[in-house]
Amino acid sequence: MGNTVHRTLPDPSPPARLLATRPCCGPGPERRPVLGEAPRFHAQAKGKNVRLDGHSRRATRRNSFCNGVTFTQRPIRLYEQVRLRLVAVRPGWSGALRFGFTAHDPSLMSAQDIPKYACPDLVTRPGYWAKALPENLALRDTVLAYWADRHGRVFYSVNDGEPVLFHCGVAVGGPLWALIDVYGITDEVQLLESAFADTLTPARLSQARFSACLPPSSHDAANFDNNELENNQVVAKLGHLALGRAPGPPPADAAAAAIPCGPRERPRPASSPALLEADLRFHATRGPDVSLSADRKVACAPRPDGGRTLVFSERPLRPGESLFVEVGRPGLAAPGALAFGITSCDPGVLRPNELPADPDALLDRKEYWVVARAGPVPSGGDALSFTLRPGGDVLLGINGRPRGRLLCVDTTQALWAFFAVRGGVAGQLRLLGTLQSSPATTTPSGSLSGSQDDSDSDMTFSVNQSSSASESSLVTAPSSPLSPPVSPVFSPPEPAGIKNGECTVCFDGEVDTVIYTCGHMCLCHSCGLRLKRQARACCPICRRPIKDVIKIYRP
């Protein structure tokens, strides 16, 4: 099934023999030595949470979601498939197995050389190549196979399915060890018997699908400098690696991967309001891995590994204004949850080459930055609305349905919106327009009474990724008691001084505590003390570390 033929290697260890494979190019077959011993996990080079069975064929991660990096005990030959069975999967974490190769001998590694994460900790170092398996493929008993060819390309397949090209530029001049990070929802994996993959003929190679569905998690959004190849570059080069190109029209997938970024003439989503102002565009300042259409209304990020794809609104949002965007391309699955944020920093003063891949890295800047993950993964073509209320609440809507409060921000200063566009064929963000509410407009009856259905997907702030779930439980932004109406219209804000506001943790006590050093006021004193005692405690609004909480007294 698919483009691979498995030739199972025997368990006994006979002398090395030669295996003739289907020629890739040239008149004769390529002959490669095959080791009889199946690969095993390296007994010493592993993360501190990894436990191996007696045969070093099964790796189990204990505790937390990280520190699960492992390697094979021997190098992997070119075209030799590393075959893994996902034995145990535990929902509740974010992200799944990471896999790839390294040119570094695990036997020479010390415990200090093995970090918590393969992505981004290892892949930002020379000689490491790895990416994430999409969570929708990380199912129990799934068999993953991946291999490298002599051109430095890495392919993978799931359950003997079609091969998917997901890496280029791997150094194949020396030995390569398999790198496997038992991460996130993946709890246990088992190394299976090796098999060799057929080399792909030019015709089959031209039909090989480039992976557009390896979305980075928050940990993967680092700088993948050693893996820089955009989809359109890969597709353009597939037929020129001493293979020639098969005659005929280009494959559909290649055309899809090279879709230009432009303002496509297609109808506006039916869920968006009919009358939207079209005065807002993306700012010219953007990440180096994202492109804008000529009118700066569409942002495209073709890289499946994400990259540095930050885009900003051209002007600050106005209090009471709703921003409407369309995520992805209709009919295609969106590649990952959208990262959205608010900042007081004028994008015009930023340098594009200094913009990070992970927007959380901006929280250390002196300006005001707030980052949130926009809830559940949207589908391609979904219309999202972000409403900045005069009181500072930022409300999220998906396809015209209110989904609760996303952020609480300081509206005493000019605030720009920014997004991290996820890569791949579906990596596109289109500005639909804005809608300004009238303060004098009376809200429809019942529009301010949030139901359970309206807030069943309330958002959480992006917390310190090294914290455990229990450590960050108090940092979760609780659901807003007020859900926005489908059409963004608002009542006048309450006069200052009438109410101090409710605690964003318990939603019961009155806000009477200042967080030091950021100065935000969003907690009652009891919740502030509880939060301060948590490991790596950080502000629910800006995520800066909490050094102290100070109770205030009002006259």
UniProtKB/Swiss-Prot annotation:
Gene Ontology molecular function, alphabetical: ubiquitin protein ligase activity; zinc ion binding
Highest rank taxon of the organism: Eukaryota
EC class of the enzyme, as a word: transferase
Known partners and oligomeric status: Interacts with JAG1, DLL1 and DLL4.
The protein's Enzyme Commission number: 2.3.2.27
Start and end residues of each NHR domain: 38-194, 279-433
GO biological process: Notch signaling pathway; protein ubiquitination; ubiquitin-dependent endocytosis
GO CC term (a single one): early endosome
Catalytic activity field: S-ubiquitinyl-[E2 ubiquitin-conjugating enzyme]-L-cysteine + [acceptor protein]-L-lysine = [E2 ubiquitin-conjugating enzyme]-L-cysteine + N(6)-ubiquitinyl-[acceptor protein]-L-lysine
Broad class of the protein's primary localization: cytoplasm
Originating gene: NEURL1B
Name listed for the protein in its UniProt record: E3 ubiquitin-protein ligase NEURL1B
Biological role stated in the UniProt entry: E3 ubiquitin-protein ligase involved in regulation of the Notch pathway through influencing the stability and activity of several Notch ligands.
Biased composition (Pro residues): 481-493
Location(s) in or outside the cell: Cytoplasm
Tissue occurrence: Highest expression in brain, prostate and small intestine. In the brain the levels are higher in fetal than in adult stage. In the adult brain the highest levels are detected in the olfactory system, cerebellar cortex, optic nerve and the frontal lobe.
Pathway(s) where this gene product acts: Protein modification; protein ubiquitination
Stretches for region Disordered: 436-493
Coiled coil (residue ranges): none
Organism: Homo sapiens
Annotated positions of the Phosphothreonine modification: T199
Database matches in Pfam families: Neuralized, zf-C3HC4_3
